[in-house]
Amino acid sequence: MYGNYSHFMKFPAGYGGSPGHTGSTSMSPSAALSTGKPMDSHPSYTDTPVSAPRTLSAVGTPLNALGSPYRVITSAMGPPSGALAAPPGINLVAPPSSQLNVVNSVSSSEDIKPLPGLPGIGNMNYPSTSPGSLVKHICAICGDRSSGKHYGVYSCEGCKGFFKRTIRKDLIYTCRDNKDCLIDKRQRNRCQYCRYQKCLVMGMKREAVQEERQRSRERAESEAECASSGHEDMPVERILEAELAVEPKTESYGDMNMENSTNDPVTNICHAADKQLFTLVEWAKRIPHFSDLTLEDQVILLRAGWNELLIASFSHRSVSVQDGILLATGLHVHRSSAHSAGVGSIFDRVLTELVSKMKDMQMDKSELGCLRAIVLFNPDAKGLSNPSEVETLREKVYATLEAYTKQKYPEQPGRFAKLLLRLPALRSIGLKCLEHLFFFKLIGDTPIDTFLMEMLETPLQIT
């Protein structure tokens, strides 16, 4: 099992040797260590006693240069249970003390590789039994797992919440028994009086709850002030005014339909969009701070978002139309006409993802104006000289819209998020429309950039 270690020990001639062997004979380490007397007490022992190697390089073993692995292990663990009995008269003592020096000279526990089947010294794990570490993980009130220090005491989420509710609501409890009920993980809800008293006894502080409430109130007020300062700089009233100023008069167009026109739906939509480009520039000028941007950036923003801006407008205008859209020219394009013209798929998306959603949530003009302003202030538009300024303006519109929905629709806390969810659909539909509407490159014989530049340089007409 342990191999041949005859070069470590020498024993009397004739003992255990093969026939004809007259020199010193090796002895198994297990037999040697099972005896009780020193090796040199035997009369025939003539060689030097066993000693640990002094240098690692002098040892001719493959096991980490520690000499016999049997010595290293048995010095700490004792002889193995399967040790062979030594013949009478041969007694050996335990390994000399010098062997301990060999073990202690090992640089780390990784240098000691145990024999197969024996655990490594460095892999022994001992659980921590420090009282302090246990207290931090146990609720001082009920003994459940602690989630941290709450109101001065390590406690679980249940006891933390119970104490906070008691203080904030100023609750008063009574005990049905003798005010000495057991409060533990299983029975903590049985008696609220005793549970609250134990919270106090263990050190929970009433003032800590009150201070937490005060901090929350101050933080909410601070956030409200920040939001207020944001939307005061981008008043929703001015955004609504911009929408109303360019709103086409379509009251008398309700009875008109596609049959009144000889053109196909795509041509009619193009003509309507052509007309709306003029009013779109007027609308943008009325949006707060848009005119403060450089003229080049104004052109870039309108060119990047015109399709989405127009689609949002006629989609909201069409919420009162049955299964179709109402153009700014007053024409009503029905779903069947769009399918006949080969644009049914994109037309259906406009109806289901925009018109229907706007109708379901009853989106008002102020919300529409804010969504369009968010589209207008696109900091990702290519070529902007100052994208960060545009992004700041967009964030102000976000703040204005959020404040408006909270004030106007307090019973709908998710309304702001619902409004923003229309923007990805608007972007996707806008990109798809460009495949069908080719008019955007030219306004008659005028390139769109030149047209927009001329429109933006024209003074705003206040009506």
UniProtKB/Swiss-Prot annotation:
GO CC list: cytoplasm; nucleoplasm
UniProt feature, compositional bias: Polar residues: 21-33
CDD domains from the UniProt entry: NR_DBD_RXR, NR_LBD_RXR_like
UniProt DNA-binding residue ranges: 139-204
BP term (GO), one: retinoic acid receptor signaling pathway
GO MF annotation terms: molecular condensate scaffold activity; nuclear steroid receptor activity; sequence-specific double-stranded DNA binding; zinc ion binding
Start-end of NR C4-type zinc fingers: 139-159, 175-194
Protein location: Nucleus; Cytoplasm
Annotated ranges, domain NR LBD: 231-459
Biased amino acid composition, Basic and acidic residues: 211-222
Pfam family, one: Nuc_recep-AF1
Location of the region described as Disordered in the Swiss-Prot/TrEMBL record: 18-53, 211-232
Post-translational modification: Acetylated by EP300.
Domain of life assignment: Eukaryota
Span list, region Modulating: 1-138
SUPFAM superfamilies assigned: Glucocorticoid receptor-like (DNA-binding domain) (SSF57716), Nuclear receptor ligand-binding domain (SSF48508)
Keyword Nucleotidyltransferase annotated: no
PROSITE patterns: NR_LBD, NUCLEAR_REC_DBD_1, NUCLEAR_REC_DBD_2
Chain positions covered by the region annotation Hinge: 205-230
Swiss-Prot/TrEMBL keywords: Cytoplasm, DNA-binding, Metal-binding, Nucleus, Receptor, Transcription, Transcription regulation, Zinc, Zinc-finger
Subunit comment: Homodimer. Heterodimer with a RAR molecule. Binds DNA preferentially as a RAR/RXR heterodimer. Interacts with RARA.
Family: Belongs to the nuclear hormone receptor family. NR2 subfamily.
Entry domain remark: Composed of three domains: a modulating N-terminal domain, a DNA-binding domain and a C-terminal ligand-binding domain.
Protein name per the record: Retinoic acid receptor RXR-gamma
Origin organism lineage: Eukaryota, Metazoa, Chordata, Craniata, Vertebrata
